[in-house]
Each structure stands twice: as C-alpha cells, then as structure tokens.
Swiss-Prot record:
The lineage of its organism: Bacteria, Bacillati, Bacillota, Bacilli, Bacillales. This is Segregation and condensation protein B. Homodimer. Homodimerization may be required to stabilize the binding of ScpA to the Smc head domains. Component of a cohesin-like complex composed of ScpA, ScpB and the Smc homodimer, in which ScpA and ScpB bind to the head domain of Smc. The presence of the three proteins is required for the association of the complex with DNA. It comes from the Bacteria. Participates in chromosomal partition during cell division. May act via the formation of a condensin-like complex containing Smc and ScpA that pull DNA away from mid-cell into both cell halves. HAMAP family: ScpB. It is found in: Cytoplasm. The keyword Amino-acid biosynthesis does not apply. Belongs to the ScpB family.
Amino acid sequence: MDRKEQKSIIEGLLFVSGDEGIYPEQIAKVLEIEMNEVMNILEEMQQECEGANRGLQIVQYAKVYRFATKKEHASYYQKLIDTPTAASLSQAALETLAIVAYRQPITRTEMEEIRGVKTDKALQTLVSHLLIKEMGRAEGPGRPILYGTTKEFLDTFGLKTLDDLPPLSEENEQMNEADLFFGSLQEISK
C-alpha cells in the first residue's frame, strides 16, 4: 500500500474515531505498519493541514490523535451553533413545534392526541434545539410536564412575541395547526 493510501486510511480513522481520538498504536495495528512510520505519516498530515486552505487540523491530546477545527475559524462555528434553523428539523418536529406554539402550555399526551402519533423523538429534538422547554407540570394524575416555546423559538422564526403568530380564524381552526404554521413561516421568511 502506498503512502497516499495510508494517509487516506488514517484520515478516515481519525474521522470515525471522533472526539475520542485514536492512539498511534491502533493505527499501526490497523494498517499493519511500524509505529515510527505511523508517527512520520501523522506528522506529514499535521503539516499538510496547517495550510490556510484547510478547515481541520490534526491535534494530539493525551497520546491520542484526532481532528479539530481551527481556532481562527471559531467565530464562524459559533454563528452556526447560535442559529438553529427550521431546515434542520424533521417534518414530525415541525408539526410538533406548531402544535406547541399554538396550544402552549401543552403536555406530551395532548400533542400526541392532536398528531395521532408518538412525539417523544420530536420533543427531544425540539428541546435540544432550544426551541421548546419545560414550563412546569399539569395538575392531575402523574402531573405531566407542560411544554412551551422559548425565546430562541421567537428568534429563529423572526417573531417578536407569540402574538406575532398568525391568528387562528374560525375557518383556520378547522385546519391542521401545522399547516397553518408552515404557511405563516413562509410568509414571515419572504
């Protein structure tokens, strides 16, 4: 196997090892090559990644090698993290979000009754995107969690307050909340 292929494989190993990284000994074992050769290849790859036209670098922490983003690009990564988008949400999550937006505070069971399917995964996604949060507990058996939208929800969808959501007219009350919400989002984003 030539040097180019070895680098390619090591690059893949670094990628799949993720944040945990990979020991050079593991690379040597996988590629069936000597440790000094692994170290030489890693050093070459580190130098190649130092160029200004590369977004990743290979770093060593506690004897483990892994990919990391470059510090000088941190402000761009932060912008991405700070702006969750509706495009990254599944259809189920968007439908659930619309229900929460119009019916908050609302329990998971109430959402499932409206949607007709389980909402566990959609709720986890919305909470992790900081678009909804726990607002307290409902009275009654089991004291279920009540969910509502967050400031991040308003920011993400360009709303100042929940009053900026399109009103549910008598005609629209028959319409699925999700359909109405998606329509309103298209209007807001124009």
